[in-house]
Design a protein with these regions (language model features):
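Carbohydrate-active enzyme catalytic cores, enriched for enzymes
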Residues: 1-87, 141-143
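Residue-level marker for the onset of beta-strands and adjacent loop->beta junctions
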Residues: 48, 76, 115, 146, ...
Length: 187
């Protein structure tokens, strides 16, 4: 019988297989200097989060919905840094209090869309709940650019009278620039 079948039938699979593999590599692992990999682009599809950089610029942006764990009403928000320093920021989180986890959480400024870099449309902020979300979210990565598109219109109540609000965030690595373009269609 093959060794892989023995591991599978032993009841210790996959643990013992991983341990044996690591033990067989121990000498190589001990003599290898750890190096932090440099990530120029990351896309977390389930969370609809993009992080893209080129050594100078870094952009992080999110789609998602307004019912996520520790939610803020911030679909379409982003932050930008240049040479490791904030260039365009998002207010972010405040100190957690009992109000943070109560039905009054959206009275707190840092949880409201008004205090994030998303628009207030016709006087309306984004609403909380899973039905308030980014749609038609897309991410494209090439060696020269990273692009995220998110339509944030569904993050707002009907009263905002917005049909489509597509936010396009681009890091152009070749031209060393970031662009944010808004495509807006009102009802």
């Amino acid at each position: 019988s093959k060794p892989s079948m023995l591991f599978l039938q032993s009841g210790n699979w996959p643990t013992i297989g991983i341990e044996l593999m690591l033990l067989s590599m121990l000498h190589k692992l001990q003599s290898t200097k750890p190096v932090q990999p440099r990530t120029t682009d990351a896309w977390l599809a389930n969370s609809q989060i993009m992080v893209a950089g080129n050594g100078k610029w870094l952009i992080a942006a999110k789609g998602g919905n307004n019912a996520e764990s520790h939610n803020h009403n911030d679909v379409g928000s982003f932050i930008i840094t240049y040479n490791g320093k904030p260039a365009l920021i998002d207010l972010g989180r405040d100190t957690y209090t009992s109000q943070t986890f109560s039905n009054r959480r959206y009275e707190m400024m840092n949880n409201r869309s008004k205090y994030h870099n998303v628009p207030v449309i016709n006087g309306y902020e984004q609403k909380d709940g899973s039905e308030y979300k980014g749609i038609d979210v897309d991410h494209t990565y090439t060696d020269s650019a990273s692009v995220m598109l998110v339509d944030i219109a569904k993050a707002y109540p009907k009263e905002a009278e917005v049909k489509s609000w597509v936010r396009r965030l681009t890091l152009n690595r070749k031209l060393n620039k970031i662009s944010i373009v808004e495509y807006i269609v009102m009802d």
